[in-house]
């Protein structure tokens, strides 16, 4: 969804698409790069595709931030978390209808490999843990803007 969201932003210039790509992209794509769920390593094409695809999300969001001067506001954290919750809830029936091996947003089972989900409860309860982490990460992603805003308002 982050890929589609940043592409839609570039076509429409609607800030809502940027915001979703910003929070979901930096958290999801960032985690995907740090802990890839591919079973192969470099130079296998699946590994390269995975890394390039997720890097393009981050590059697209960074481009919008630098060139278009976009940034999130505090209220946007809540709006994007609400949208991500709706998407997460819709992913289970979509994965179910698609059948195995569909596991978009990892709602059916945990991703393979060593990653943070190893410390979470078994499926489907791991989604509660993932949701809590997503909330925390979205607020952490916003902290630099919060600090910047506080510093600017405290200057005479």
Regions found by a protein language model. Give the residues of each.
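Membrane-interface capping segments at transmembrane-helix boundaries
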Residues: 70-72, 142-156
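Membrane-interface helix caps and helix-loop-helix hairpins in membrane proteins
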Residues: 11-16, 36-48
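Alpha-helical transmembrane segments in multipass membrane proteins, preferentially the mid-helix core
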Residues: 6, 57-73
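Membrane-interface transmembrane-helix boundary segments in multi-pass integral membrane proteins
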Residues: 79-82, 86, 98-138
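Cytoplasmic-side transmembrane-helix entry/capping segments in multi-pass membrane proteins
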Residues: 18-26, 50
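Membrane-interface loop-to-helix entry segments
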Residues: 45-59
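Aromatic-anchored segments of alpha-helical transmembrane domains
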Residues: 25-36, 84-93
């Amino acid at each position: 969804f982050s890929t589609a969201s940043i592409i839609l932003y570039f076509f429409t210039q609607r800030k809502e698409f940027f915001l979703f790509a910003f929070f979901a992209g930096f958290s999801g794509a960032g985690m995907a790069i740090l802990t890839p769920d591919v079973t192969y390593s470099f130079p296998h094409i699946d590994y390269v595709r995975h890394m390039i695809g997720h890097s393009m999300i981050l590059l697209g969001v960074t481009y919008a931030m630098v060139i278009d001067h976009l940034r999130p506001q505090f209220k946007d954290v809540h709006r994007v978390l609400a949208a991500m919750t709706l998407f997460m809830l819709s992913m289970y029936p979509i994965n179910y209808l698609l059948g195995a091996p569909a596991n978009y947003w990892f709602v059916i089972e945990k991703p393979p490999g060593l990653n943070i989900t190893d410390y979470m409860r078994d499926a489907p309860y791991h989604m509660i843990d993932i949701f809590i982490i997503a909330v925390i990460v979205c607020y952490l992603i916003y902290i630099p803007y919060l600090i910047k805003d506080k510093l600017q308002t405290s200057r005479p």
